[in-house]
Regions:
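Hydrophobic/aromatic beta-strand elements that line small-molecule binding cavities or substrate pockets
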Residues: 6-8, 51, 60-65, 84-91, ...
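Amphipathic alpha-helical segments that line or abut small-molecule/effector binding pockets
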Residues: 15-18, 126, 130
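Short acidic, gly/pro-rich beta-turn/loop elements at beta-sheet edges
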Residues: 16-18, 29, 59-61, 74, ...
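Glycine-rich portal/gate segments that line the openings of hydrophobic small-molecule binding cavities
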Residues: 38-81, 97, 127-138
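Beta-strand/loop substructures that line and gate deep hydrophobic ligand-binding cavities in soluble
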Residues: 77-123, 127, 134
Length: 138
């Protein structure tokens, strides 16, 4: 498994940050590694969806758990990616620390390439966090 942690401090309220990051249908706007999202079902705070990732246009299934104003936990349930991506909102003084933690690997025979894609995922996450921060602070 590759663990990747990226965080940024956003000059805003938890409510405003949550408003932007919890709109998970908007994910491709900020996360360039996600090309397309399709919600399959929604029950309370649990969303099941199919995403198309930029890596070879692969489709993956995810189960998303929303904990309002706290975190978004995406668990990859089927496809080339195996593991989780967790986005946390951590109040800090009058700001919010937005922290993304990946615990992920490529599944099956592709597992040997996990180390290679780790830097790509980290770079994409840094760009996404920067874009989210800019959107919120504008």
């Amino acid at each position: 498994m590759a663990t990747i942690v990226v965080q940024t401090e956003v000059n805003s309220t938890v409510e405003k940050v949550w408003e932007v990051v919890s709109n998970i249908d908007n994910e491709p706007r900020f996360w360039k590694g996600t090309k397309e999202v399709k919600t399959l079902s929604k029950e309370g705070n649990i969303i099941k969806r199919e995403i198309t990732i930029a890596f070879r246009d692969q489709k993956c299934l995810q189960e998303i758990q929303l904990k309002p104003k706290e975190e978004i936990k995406a668990r990859f349930t089927k496809g080339i990616l195996d593991g989780t991506k967790i986005i946390m909102l951590i109040p800090k003084n009058n700001n919010v620390v937005l922290k993304t933690t990946w615990d992920i690997k490529l599944s099956g025979k592709m597992n040997m390439f996990t180390a290679i894609i780790k830097n790509h995922i980290k770079s994409g996450t840094e760009q996404a966090m920067k874009s989210i921060k800019e959107e919120i602070e504008k």
